[in-house]
Design a protein with these regions (language model features):
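Mobile, glycine-rich extracellular loop/lid and propeptide segments
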Residues: 385-388
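Intrinsically disordered, low-complexity cytosolic terminal tails
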Residues: 1-19
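N-terminal accessory/cap region of cofactor-dependent oxidoreductases and related radical enzymes
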Residues: 17-371, 375, 394-529, 533, ...
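Hydrophobic, mid-to-C-terminal alpha-helical segments
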Residues: 556-559
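Secondary-structure edge/capping motif, primarily at the C-terminal ends of alpha-helices
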Residues: 376-380
Length: 692
């Protein structure tokens, strides 16, 4: 692969610099520069703070014994005279103060025309593999191979499948041109000093639990080179040419390589599954619940293929004395940017090998499953393989829910949005709620978090020295890089501050150039262009409609966007789109200023908040729902609530010390006292002990 970027030059304010040789200014002695004085002041403050923390913070305690201040709603209030608990605070239910209600008219079409007949056993304790029978009134809701939910009707130019056009009838501007004009070389090297890089792989891992739509077979196998799209004597425009992303001749990156088009593969529509629906409808291949289906599989055949059928454990193999997912000889992803990968993992998610961070977490949870299965079997020797497996699978799904709602989402959305959208407190199951993933979420709002993907991933050794730096594009389709680097990659995510929130993606995921194998030419990859095009592919409404849907004032002119978008960006939008009503949703979502302590703007928070409320309230098996055949006991729920990602990482790796709040950036050099020995991170399984 050829990239147009050097290694990150730390003297630059930009994350990445193009290959342009610029003469360096004559350097002054460093002790005469203002930053050196500032550095000395900060160093003195840091040392003083460290000494205070070291003296007063518990150093040998357990993360489970720290007395954190609890939210007011969960606080137990005592009367000095009677010493009784105030009943007002006895139980706090998750209730949103803001709810968006779907305006779409097509959500029921699949269930009327194509849904299979399903027979359910209401007394089943465990989830089905494909997600059916979660909702007993609507057994197909949220199941694999059912459509994404829509909050608003799809918008296609022909009402069926062709890309939306502008109000004046002109095509929408090229996704690549939009990205270049708004964001090119505007990525700033700025770190999030509160959070580490672990937010990125967890977000990707979570996405693969709830979403998977395969490529349309009509153009998934077409050649990467698209020169034939410019042949003028064609009587019919090839399918792949209609959806390709146009690149301007003066493109600052691809112009010099004569790259004029990006290949774009559309999502596979329902008609490919013998269900012709209008407008174009996309089926989700994964279950639409947070249930660890990406670990275990979304159908019984896949799930059975991953099992040993002994002691409830999953198949694995040992490589370099470490446990990894089994080999998948039928993997579709064998050639990455660094060459062929002989390692191809098998997991519940078909895309396990797509991204090294996803492969890391798949292997992490494989190991944790097998650890828990061993412990549960010891606790209950009489249990069958099936019972140990199902109970462990049930616990793993609950753990992913706890980590997501208690630790991940509060950072992404902030406390105010968490409360506003009903994402805190005890879950009350509501069978009238369809938990299915919104198309506006998977093709729009959640993709906006690609703006925190860093320019590089660090691999760190046990003594915290960086042994390798890799660009995100290098870890695509290269699962072999994980072997021998498992712990190093985890340390790198933990010990590297995250990318600060900013509208632009980093340049190393928007300007990738690679040589086309066996051809005299180049092609490229731009994640932002693909995200914009994916929204058009799946018929997302434009930004103005989405913000109005979320309760914001509808803009009549571009300047009406100034409540959330900077005037500079508004001027650029004017040069790109015909009217304010034409702006792509993801563009508006990226440009919105974050509010209320969140990492996203209000229209993004609205869609993310709605989706995760429905994942929670519409899931009969959600971990803290009571009164169902599959409900955990109160003691089991209490044990699950104490778990963090640190428990999983400590048990499933060779790391020795971890902070309790795993996503928070804790520099080992200055804050080692709040990194606890991994022996402290143990899930209390005693509530699962069965007494005969």
């Amino acid at each position: 692969m050829v990239t147009i970027f050097k290694k990150v030059d730390n003297s630059s304010p930009f994350e990445t610099d193009p290959l342009l040789s610029k003469s360096k200014a004559e350097k002054q002695p460093f002790w005469k520069k203002p930053w050196f004085t500032l550095f000395i002041v900060i160093l003195i403050i840091a040392i003083a703070t460290t000494v205070i923390v070291y003296i007063f913070y518990p150093k040998n305690g357990s993360p489970n014994t720290i007395n954190f201040i609890k939210p007011e709603a969960n606080r137990v209030i005592f009367n000095v005279a009677t010493l009784t608990r105030n009943p007002v605070y006895a139980e706090v239910k998750a209730q949103p103060t803001s709810r968006v209600m779907s305006l779409a008219t097509t959500n029921g079409d699949y269930f009327k025309k194509c849904a299979p007949f399903v027979t359910c056993n209401p007394d089943d304790k465990y989830r089905t593999y494909n997600g059916s029978c979660n909702n007993l009134q609507n057994p197909n809701w949220g199941a694999a191979l059912t459509p994404f939910y829509r909050l608003m009707d799809a918008e296609f130019n022909d009402g069926n499948e062709t890309f939306r056009v502008q109000l004046d009838g002109r095509p929408l501007p090229s996704a690549r041109v939009v990205g270049v004009k708004l964001f090119y070389m505007k990525d700033i090297r700025n770190f999030d000093h509160e959070n580490n890089e672990l937010l990125v792989p967890w977000g990707q891992f979570l996405t693969h639990d709830i979403s998977f739509y395969p490529d349309d077979i009509r153009n998934s196998s077409t050649p990467a080179h698209l020169d034939h799209c410019f042949e003028k004597d064609k009587t019919k425009i090839p399918f792949e040419c209609k959806t390709a992303i146009m690149i301007a001749k003066d493109d600052p990156v691809y112009g010099q390589y004569n790259v004029s088009l990006f290949k774009f593969v559309r999502s596979m529509p329902s008609v490919n599954f013998s269900c012709p629906l209008t407008p174009r409808t996309i089926l989700n291949r994964n279950t639409q619940y947070i249930d660890a289906s990406h670990v275990y599989g979304s159908d019984k055949k896949i799930a059975d293929g991953l099992r040993t059928f002994e002691n409830g454990k999953l198949r694995s193999r040992i490589l370099k004395n470490e446990e990894y997912c089994p080999q998948n000889p039928d993997s579709e992803f064998k050639d990455g940017p660094l060459g062929k990968s002989n390692v191809q993992f098998a997991a519940g998610d078909k895309n396990v090998n797509q991204n090294l961070a996803i492969a890391l977490f798949q292997n992490l949870f494989l190991r944790y499953h097998n650890h828990l299965a061993d412990e549960i079997q010891k606790l209950n020797p009489s249990w069958s393989d099936e019972k140990v497996y199902q109970e462990t699978r049930r616990i793993i799904g609950a753990i992913i829910q706890v980590i997501t709602y208690e630790h991940f989402l509060p950072i992404i959305l902030g406390d105010e949005y968490m409360k506003e959208y009903g994402l805190t407190g005890q879950t009350t199951y509501d069978p009238s709620i369809n938990s299915a993933l919104a198309q506006e979420m998977t093709s729009g709002a959640f993709r906006a978090l690609h703006n925190i993907i860093p320019a590089k991933f660090n691999f760190m050794s046990a003594n915290y020295s960086i042994v390798d730096e890799v660009e995100p594009s290098r870890v695509l389709l290269q699962p072999d890089l994980l072997i021998g680097n498992f712990d190093n990659m985890l340390r790198g995510f933990l010990e590297t501050p995250g990318r600060a929130v900013q509208p632009s993606y980093n340049n190393l995921i928007t300007n990738i150039v690679f040589k086309i194998p066996h051809l005299d030419g180049y092609s490229g990859f731009d994640l932002l262009s693909y995200d914009i095009q994916r929204g058009r592919d799946n018929g997302l409404p434009p930004y103005n409609k989405m913000r109005h849907f979320c309760g914001l004032k509808k803009a009549n002119t571009f300047n009406d966007l100034s409540d959330l978008i900077s005037l500079e960006d508004i001027e650029t939008l004017k040069s790109l789109y015909s009217t304010v009503h034409d702006i792509d949703y993801i563009i508006g979502a990226l440009l919105e200023k974050p509010r209320n302590g969140s990492m996203v703007g209000p229209s993004t928070a609205c869609i993310i908040g709605d989706s995760f409320y429905r994942f929670k309230a519409g899931d009969r098996f959600f971990y803290d729902v009571l009164g169902q055949p599959g409900s955990f006991t109160p003691a089991q729920i209490e044990a699950l609530k104490k778990i963090t990602l640190s428990h999983v990482m400590c048990t499933s790796s060779n790391l020795n010390h971890m902070q309790k709040e795993t996503f928070r950036f804790v520099d080992h050099r200055w804050m080692s006292s709040i990194k606890y020995n991994c022996k402290s991170y143990k899930l209390d399984l005693s509530p699962w002990k069965e007494f005969s």
